[in-house]
């Protein structure tokens, strides 16, 4: 039979199997032949309220309520459309010839409710559901059932034979509606949850399987000729042999589903299940956190096979319940990973973050510091940088500079491991925020390099430049002076040549002459300079040689008279 995957609204499965046709639009359902359908959709139990009941009818319905319907959320024109199970199943059935039979699997919360009204479903159908009408399903378990069914080219009955133990734990139900006759078989995990030891399970499964064999053989004998595509194989009378690991999986699945559907009777069942050895409690712990059920969580954390995973810590952080978080991180198997710290930073709750970083396995990485800087919460950042494993890297300083928050930057540079690099100074210059720059250059490890001065000159901001050249480690090099001359900004040049370490070299004079700016020439000339050297170099020059770009003779005569140059 052709296998069809029907995905509801907000459901996306990675369907890598080319033999399975995937559809979202119910108008594209196949016709003219029966298929095996797999419906993945969000489901909810729905009770139809009959407003036309009289008083007696209302009293009767109170004590004997009508069975529920399944409401599925399907896609329609890009939006979500609630649809009753009867409507959806009949839409499938009406596309199928009357003498054929579809197989339909529903993987949704409350899928068992779809079994209640088969008498309203047209045609012939085999309906498989994977939990009780009142129970939520677990996505991972639904996917496991689906993947197990499609990975082999086996018949439905072979699938049930091979996975009977897990189907019992899932409260699996199967119904056959053939020629207007309905046959139903339902499995229940309740007995498993009350077992005292794992040794009871094989006996129970053997008995349940024997009951199912009789159920199937009865239908097979009656219908295998009329519906050979459904009854294409007889059932094996012996159940599949199970290993100890298989039995543990049964208990684990029962535990997971009971936790997900926790009610006032659940805790005693769960504590009974936890007497079994080797159960996987990952999903159950996650659900206890989701429910903020401290009593349930405590029972699960006390179980000797519980291991805290990194994603469990993330879930606890996201939940934001401090008591729940403390209980989880206190577990002996907890190991804080760097992405747990990131998650706590993103949460923005100081108490939550402190509970995480206080753990003995915490190690602050440089990207955690970046994350705290980006968050922009000073208390959060201080809690991170205060940790004993924190080491400030140069790119953390760059990140704080880029953030532009002075308090954030101060918290970073105040750390004992901070060392200001020359490119941090460049970054602060480029930022153009005077307070940010001052906080950087004020650090004890700051050393101004000549290329930092060039960067400040290029920036063209006088206050920024003054903050750089005012530093005690600043030494003006001749090429810094050339850079200031080339910039063409008088105030910038004045700030450079005014520095105590400035020494004008002859090529600085050459540079200003090439520029042809008399005001700059004045600034250079006014600086302490060896006049004798200048006269020796230029006494044979005409002013046309010195300043060919300038034509204002009176001004030139005044400005170069010190040179002893010949005016022509």
From Swiss-Prot:
It comes from the Bacteria. This is Uncharacterized protein RP612. It comes from Rickettsia prowazekii (strain Madrid E).
